[in-house]
């Protein structure tokens, strides 16, 4: 056994984080150096190829590879099968698709009164093509592999050791930090080029304000749905789209994207308190029973 393989087996999450940040940031580099980025290269290099490759190869493929090295082929196959695990009740799919838009609508009514309902009624026909279809496409192409890294690999390992709430809090700044290079790329974090003066605000937003409630809620959905990656991916993309320009302008005019994350923060606090920090994770006795039934419980970090 090589020393590298031994190191990965001893510390799989550290090994994966090195692969994740090193690989993803290298793939972000061409667009970052091009005219849509900081402009060191004379050509405009689109960001999409690097982003898609980072998601598919590093976040998805890399997490499977490290699982295979650390835990063996059977564990890697079980890990990969989570990408097609659909065994959750219909109420969870309704929550994943419509929960965040409805939460923001409630917040809009509280802020603006009953008039906030009018844009929704007037533009309801825009929902299938402007929200539902791109939601499913993006969840399948991007968010399943993305959450294979954050939920299925990192959170799932850490929550067995330090608990789901602490695991979510640990993953949150890492999730935000990975996105930092996108700040300097046109269209990376916003539709246009962000001024450097906005960097401190976006850094706080990425590292704390947006990511902490999002990771808490995603962990809750993950644990409550028998670790269904497709469902978690849909919920993740629903958050991104609801806070995006189309949904805000069409259904919530006058509501700033920060209010979306404020509403999510309230929801995350309610979930954390209601579940006593377990976020849907079975008790240790229940987890032991699952292990006896043949479900692997991985605790290596």
Spans of model-derived segments:
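Specific transmembrane helices
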Residues: 2-143, 171, 184, 206, ...
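Alpha-helical transmembrane segments and their helix-entry boundary regions
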Residues: 13-17, 93, 153, 167-168, ...
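Alpha-helical transmembrane segments of multi-pass membrane transport proteins
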Residues: 99, 147, 210-211
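Hydrophobic/aromatic residues in alpha-helical transmembrane segments
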Residues: 106, 154, 214-218
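Membrane-interface helix/loop boundary segments of multi-pass membrane proteins
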Residues: 145-177, 223-228
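Membrane-interface interhelical connector segments
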Residues: 149, 153-158, 184-199
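Functionally important transmembrane alpha-helices
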Residues: 193-262
């Amino acid at each position: 056994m090589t020393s590298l393989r031994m190191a990965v087996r001893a510390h799989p999450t550290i090994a994966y984080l090195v692969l994740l940040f090193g690989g993803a940031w290298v793939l972000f580099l061409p667009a970052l150096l091009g005219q849509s980025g900081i402009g060191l290269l004379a050509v405009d290099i689109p960001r999409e190829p690097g982003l898609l490759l980072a998601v598919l190869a590093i976040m998805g493929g890399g997490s499977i590879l490290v699982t295979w090295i650390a835990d063996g082929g059977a564990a890697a196959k079980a890990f990969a099968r989570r990408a097609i695990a659909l065994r959750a009740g219909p109420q969870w799919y309704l929550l994943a698709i419509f929960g965040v838009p409805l939460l923001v609508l409630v917040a809009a009514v509280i802020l603006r009164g009953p008039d906030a309902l009018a844009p929704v009624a007037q533009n309801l026909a825009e929902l299938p093509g402007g929200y539902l279809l791109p939601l499913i496409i993006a969840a399948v192409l991007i968010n399943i592999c993305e959450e294979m890294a954050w939920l299925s690999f990192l959170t799932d390992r850490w929550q067995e050791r330090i608990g789901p709430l602490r695991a979510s809090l640990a993953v949150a700044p890492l999730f935000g930090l990975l996105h930092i290079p996108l700040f300097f790329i046109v269209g990376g974090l916003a539709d246009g080029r962000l001024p450097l003066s906005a960097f401190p605000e976006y850094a706080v937003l990425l590292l704390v304000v947006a990511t902490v409630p999002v990771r808490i809620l995603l962990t809750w959905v993950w644990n409550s749905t028998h670790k269904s990656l497709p469902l978690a991916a849909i919920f993740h993309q629903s958050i991104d789209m609801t806070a995006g320009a189309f949904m805000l302008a069409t259904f919530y005019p006058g509501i700033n994207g920060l209010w979306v994350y404020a509403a999510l923060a309230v929801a995350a606090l309610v979930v954390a308190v209601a579940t006593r920090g377990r976020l849907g994770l079975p008790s240790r006795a229940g987890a032991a029973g699952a292990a006896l039934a043949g479900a692997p419980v991985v605790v290596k970090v």
